[in-house]
């Protein structure tokens, strides 16, 4: 299993970096759309759609929805402050606040949505669509002036999330004693959680110094810590839905890593939340 995880990581990391820095806006949008379609395919299982045909239709409908939104906003990469994009990012904040309540009060909260495929599908839309626009909004930042400025921001969020996750794992292994959310994800501890946030703060400081980002350090730190918190919530939320669905992994598309959602669950929360804070709340970019 470890061998497959390492092989997948060595293949995926260069591919992700290449997609960030080499693809034009249209190419990046298409790749992100495909990733979202695969995520929708896996979310179908979390929503109670177990047959292959049902999940294929969900993936296709997701792709059509995102393609329609792109069609309605052909110049999004020149002006990311468009109503549809902003509504999607604000919706992500609302959804993740609701998700926090669902996780905090689980398993009691499951009584609200456990038997409703419609609600679980809505949760999926609120997870995938803002993630899609968060990715595109950050990548499109000042693209005409500097093709790589948006890629640097997106790479930062990814490093932040992966670094916080690694920090949480190490601190949890070394010092973990008190469970964070035992009914949702028994392996997570408060010590790991705090270690992850501390790691995120260090990354915020270090990356800000290296990349010379045109953002006040305090603003970057606030956005980064909130995004790191959101990444933990994204992980816990998917774990909650998987627990209700009775599955360990969301899929088997990535050898050694499970499914697409298993790899991007933290990013589905962190990316739109970070984008919303930076673009709309602080209006920094």
Swiss-Prot record:
<feature type="transmembrane region" description="Helical">
    <location>
        <begin position="56"/>
        <end position="76"/>
    </location>
</feature>
<keyword id="KW-0594">Phospholipid biosynthesis</keyword>
<comment type="pathway">
    <text>Phospholipid metabolism; CDP-diacylglycerol biosynthesis; CDP-diacylglycerol from sn-glycerol 3-phosphate: step 3/3.</text>
</comment>
<keyword id="KW-0548">Nucleotidyltransferase</keyword>
<dbReference type="GO" id="GO:0004605">
    <property type="term" value="F:phosphatidate cytidylyltransferase activity"/>
</dbReference>
<protein>
    <recommendedName>
        <fullName>Phosphatidate cytidylyltransferase</fullName>
        <ecNumber>2.7.7.41</ecNumber>
    </recommendedName>
</protein>
<keyword id="KW-0997">Cell inner membrane</keyword>
<keyword id="KW-1133">Transmembrane helix</keyword>
<keyword id="KW-1003">Cell membrane</keyword>
<feature type="transmembrane region" description="Helical">
    <location>
        <begin position="151"/>
        <end position="171"/>
    </location>
</feature>
<dbReference type="GO" id="GO:0005886">
    <property type="term" value="C:plasma membrane"/>
</dbReference>
<feature type="transmembrane region" description="Helical">
    <location>
        <begin position="121"/>
        <end position="141"/>
    </location>
</feature>
<feature type="transmembrane region" description="Helical">
    <location>
        <begin position="31"/>
        <end position="51"/>
    </location>
</feature>
<keyword id="KW-0443">Lipid metabolism</keyword>
<keyword id="KW-0472">Membrane</keyword>
<keyword id="KW-0812">Transmembrane</keyword>
<keyword id="KW-1208">Phospholipid metabolism</keyword>
<feature type="transmembrane region" description="Helical">
    <location>
        <begin position="213"/>
        <end position="233"/>
    </location>
</feature>
<feature type="transmembrane region" description="Helical">
    <location>
        <begin position="264"/>
        <end position="284"/>
    </location>
</feature>
<dbReference type="GO" id="GO:0016024">
    <property type="term" value="P:CDP-diacylglycerol biosynthetic process"/>
</dbReference>
<dbReference type="Pfam" id="PF01148">
    <property type="entry name" value="CTP_transf_1"/>
</dbReference>
<dbReference type="InterPro" id="IPR000374">
    <property type="entry name" value="PC_trans"/>
</dbReference>
<feature type="transmembrane region" description="Helical">
    <location>
        <begin position="190"/>
        <end position="210"/>
    </location>
</feature>
<keyword id="KW-0444">Lipid biosynthesis</keyword>
<comment type="similarity">
    <text>Belongs to the CDS family.</text>
</comment>
<feature type="transmembrane region" description="Helical">
    <location>
        <begin position="93"/>
        <end position="113"/>
    </location>
</feature>
<keyword id="KW-0808">Transferase</keyword>
